Amino acid sequence: LLQTLPRFHSNDFLACISLVPGHVQDAPYVEKELGTIYDLENYLSCGRFVQFWEVWNQSKSLPAASPSFESQVRAGILIVVSSTLEKVPVAKMAAYLGVNSDQLQSTLTEAASIAGEAVSIVSCDAETVTFAKSIFNAPESDSNQQPLRFSDIVSIVS
């Protein structure tokens, strides 16, 4: 289940949790760990990245999913942030990725290389991280679109 968390923007977690029998999910010996994993997945899928890192850092009882687990999670977060926002303040981006501001540049480089073509960082200065514009993070209206008149809509509805 932990290995599905870096791909939180897909349905991998739901697919894997459905494979775990109900009596195992309800067993007292895994209840705390499963609850924590559910919380971690919820924080990621809801975009509550800062809370994810807080809970992750407190959950030392969970086994490491893989040696590059945290890097893969950061790449997933970077994909979501870059497809949603064009510019992000450095302090917020560092908090989203669970690192200090002075570690941000190297963390961004590593996460962007893992994310591949899904992320294009234009610049990272002292104040702002800027991503390449896309139709999702910088939507523009279609200048060729003709305005709709009320009479056109009425003829369709009636």
What does each model-found stretch correspond to?
Residues L2-S158:
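Charged, E/D/K/R/S-rich low-complexity terminal regions of large eukaryotic assembly subunits
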